[in-house]
Amino acid sequence: MAHKTAKRSTPAGPAPRVILCVGLKSSGSTWLYNVVIHLLKEKYGAGVTAFYADNYAMFPSGTERARVLVIKAHEPSKSLVYLCRLTRGQMFLTLREPRDSIASLMQRFEHGFDGALKEAARHAARIAEIDAEEEMVTYRYEDGFFDRFETVDEIADALGIKVARAAQMRIYRSLTRDKVRQQIGKLRKSGKFGKKPDANSFDMETQWHPGHVGDGKIGKFAGVLSPAQQKK
């Protein structure tokens, strides 16, 4: 019996485990995403593939060959959430006062108020749906989780992996505000943001944007949004 030569074959071994990092924009979600990547690479090395996707159509080619998929999302589809559960993955969630999130987007990424409000409202609605149905490891921006070394150990524990304290400290120190600013500067010089970087440019691997590091202020919306905007 003749057999067709397959153009694409199913990889050997188990399917990749999916780690889903969900969050409102400007909630520290990219910091958490990078911590997850670094921790998993300590254990699995090159077997970790990381990217942004809200649905399957956004998956890069070849992801099925990874050992672990780390996916950053702001508005994950139901099927993506199910995939995480199906692969016995883990979901992380980062939250922030929505008005501060909007104010930060306007300051750092030059977003207009109406567009930022519409986007934040849509993301928040989807996140509320997931939060009501799924167990997630949740961090709030207001608690300053990104400034605590202990957060790295908590994330490793949630992932179910053992990472040496020295490696955890190295990861933490590589993701302080100053270090991330330096990294963003290097990405800019290397051309990772393109020839003419703007507020919407980003690095595919880390998801850092040119203006990603903010001032971390809580309640900043009071000085950025008008009284009418604050009530919307």
Where are these regions (language model features)?
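Amphipathic alpha-helical segments that form well-ordered structural scaffolds
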Residues: 35, 39, 126-129, 154, ...
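Amphipathic alpha-helical recognition patches that constitute DNA-binding helices
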Residues: 20, 31, 90, 171, ...
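C-terminal accessory extensions appended to soluble enzyme cores
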Residues: 209-232
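Short, flexible turn/loop "capping" segments at secondary-structure junctions
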Residues: 12-14, 130-133, 213-214
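PAPS-dependent sulfotransferase catalytic domain
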Residues: 45, 68-207
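PAPS-dependent sulfotransferase catalytic core
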Residues: 1-70
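Aromatic-acidic/polar surface patches that form glycan- and anion
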Residues: 14, 24-25, 29, 84, ...
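A structural signal for well-ordered alpha-helical segments within the folded catalytic domains
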Residues: 26, 30, 34, 96, ...
